[in-house]
């Protein structure tokens, strides 16, 4: 696919989703059955309306059955499914119905709350609609078909995705809101996080624990002793996920994360990528100065490359109260961020150090344990 975007001065090639791959392979199957000839490429319209010419990597057909495969090309966005083959079998039927299912390597939903019903193949609504429409257009109105999408590498590749968090077991999902993969875009990632949040809400939860990643997850379960069932990753998208909790009417949010990540939120930085905003030292220096810390400490902290290194200096100087000040600012900033939209959300914060453990919390830990047990 020769379509590009520019990001930070660099040129990146776009690609296409697993949903587009499945639609193209399905169309190739139908064309081979109808023409009784091999098809090396097909033209498909993606879910977003873009027309693409997709190469077909594998072809096999008989009178009323065909198999085709398309290799996933994510462009310069090398995700978990890039390069894998998406296979489709199409069998013509005597009725006019077109049905779609997933086979080997396509995950199955095991929990309520996502856009796929329990027991169904993890083929999301937009690509499902697109695959069915593509086949119907090629077949005409009076013929029917059974479509089976499968991916031999799917179960292994799925280990590198968030599917298990969503209760999708046994393989990958067939995805694609637009059908196009845009490199350096966070939208797909954010959508996955939102899906997990929606699943928790649909299961009846009205309070949620947001963590930046594995460190926070481990600390919640192994140090605080809270249930893993309340935990959802927010990655670097703190503001986005806070807004999502409000949209979904969660009443309480507990953010638990490493101090080096959450300290940024105290200064109103709600996307915590270091490439976008790395003001950790500056925030620490400002808050230490307000507490009356000596210039020598401020200068030493400013030179630290990590909050772990700064933490050692802060502890030696006896200014650990700075952590209490900062967690309260994180809480205040977060609640102010949500202030002008309803419903209201109560936010609490726990932050920790890899070397020093628990640093500070907006409430006593025993009180939080009672609230979140």
UniProtKB/Swiss-Prot annotation:
EC numbers, comma separated: 2.1.1.195
Keyword annotations from UniProtKB, A to Z: Cobalamin biosynthesis, Methyltransferase, S-adenosyl-L-methionine, Transferase
InterPro entries in UniProt: CbiD, CbiD_sf
A Pfam family annotated for this UniProt entry: CbiD
Signal sequence coordinates: none
Recorded superkingdom: Bacteria
Matching Gene3D superfamilies: CbiD-like (3.30.2110.10)
Example of a GO biological process term: methylation
Catalytic activity: Co-precorrin-5B + S-adenosyl-L-methionine = Co-precorrin-6A + S-adenosyl-L-homocysteine
Principal EC category: transferase
Functional pathway: Cofactor biosynthesis; adenosylcobalamin biosynthesis; cob(II)yrinate a,c-diamide from sirohydrochlorin (anaerobic route): step 6/10
GO MF term set: cobalt-precorrin-5B C1-methyltransferase activity
Listed HAMAP family: CbiD
Similarity comment: family membership: Belongs to the CbiD family.
PANTHER family recorded: COBALT-PRECORRIN-5B C(1)-METHYLTRANSFERASE (PTHR35863:SF1)
Name of the featured protein: Cobalt-precorrin-5B C(1)-methyltransferase
Source organism of the structure: Listeria monocytogenes serotype 4b (strain CLIP80459)
């Amino acid at each position: 696919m020769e379509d590009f975007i520019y990001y930070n001065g660099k040129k990146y090639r776009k690609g296409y989703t697993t949903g587009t791959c499945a639609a193209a392979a399905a169309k190739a199957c139908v064309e081979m059955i109808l023409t009784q000839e091999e098809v090396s490429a097909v033209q498909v319209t993606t879910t977003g309306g873009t027309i693409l010419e997709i190469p077909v990597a594998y072809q096999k057909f008989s009178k009323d059955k065909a198999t085709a495969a398309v290799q996933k090309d994510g462009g310069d966005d090398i995700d978990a499914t890039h390069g894998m083959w998406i296979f489709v079998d199409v069998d013509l039927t005597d009725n006019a119905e077109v049905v779609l299912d997933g086979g080997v390597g396509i995950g199955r939903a095991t929990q309520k709350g996502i856009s796929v019903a329990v027991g169904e193949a993890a083929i999301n609504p937009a690509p499902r609609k697109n695959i069915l429409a593509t086949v119907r257009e090629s077949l005409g109105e009076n013929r029917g078909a059974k479509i089976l999408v499968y991916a031999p590498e799917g179960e292994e590749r799925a280990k590198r995705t968030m599917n298990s968090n969503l209760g999708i077991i046994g393989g990958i999902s067939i995805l694609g809101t637009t059908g196009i993969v845009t490199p350096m875009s966070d939208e797909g990632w954010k959508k996955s996080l939102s899906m997990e949040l929606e699943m928790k809400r649909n299961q009846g939860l009205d309070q949620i624990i947001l963590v930046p990643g594995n460190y926070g997850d481990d600390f919640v379960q192994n140090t605080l002793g809270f249930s893993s069932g309340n935990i959802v990753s927010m990655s670097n998208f703190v503001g986005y996920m806070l807004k999502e909790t409000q949209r979904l009417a969660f009443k309480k949010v507990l953010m638990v994360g490493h101090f080096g990540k959450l300290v940024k939120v105290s200064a109103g930085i709600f996307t915590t990528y270091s490439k976008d905003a790395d003001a950790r030292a500056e925030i620490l220096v400002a808050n230490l100065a307000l507490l009356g810390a000596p210039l020598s400490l401020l200068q030493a902290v400013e030179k630290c490359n990590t909050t772990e290194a700064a933490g050692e200096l802060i502890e030696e100087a006896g200014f650990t109260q700075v952590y209490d000040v900062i967690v309260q600012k994180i809480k205040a900033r977060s609640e102010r961020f949500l202030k002008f939209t309803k419903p209201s959300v109560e936010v609490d914060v726990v932050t920790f150090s890899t070397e020093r453990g628990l640093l500070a919390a907006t409430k006593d830990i025993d009180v939080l344990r009672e609230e979140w047990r």
